[in-house]
Amino acid sequence: MNQFVFHNSLKSQHEGCGCLVGHLFITAAHVVEQGPFLLDANGETMTLDKADAVLYQYDRTPNGADVAVFRIPGMHSTLKLDTATPEVGTMLDTISYERISERQEGDTIFSQHSKEWFEIKEGQATITQVDGNFFLCDTSIILKQGASGSPVFRNGKVFGILHGGREGEPVACSRVLSR
């Protein structure tokens, strides 16, 4: 499944993740709210701007969602969507990326440099609260800034999109398909 989960390019000014479901790329709407998602795939960078989304819903009321969906011709995954209603106690899996920055000191200010890369993070989650199309999860790993837009899976299908949280608190997710 992790081959279908992507992070925003290092060339981007902001962070976020998303996943490919069939020919659709799905992320959190707030990830593309301030600027495009730069998707590095197949040796090229695709620019996904919110104006090009086939579905863009950034409404945090219970019947809203925090989801952006883009059609990506030429790319395909075997992932499917799970349209079940979230219920407290449901067990989920998470896959996201964490951006790692490492500063390397040199002898002079001119020889100092930074190295950046992404590290994949996989874990489990349990739904603890449901409010319309949104749900909270306790996770087995600490998800950092930049994990927004990552998928949460139930039985190998994309069940929702991570959209927020603070360290030590439950993670907030949005259903991909609104009621």
Regions from the PLM with identified roles:
Residues 100, 158-179:
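C-terminal cap/linker of serine protease catalytic domains
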Residues 19, 140-163:
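Catalytic nucleophile loop of clan PA
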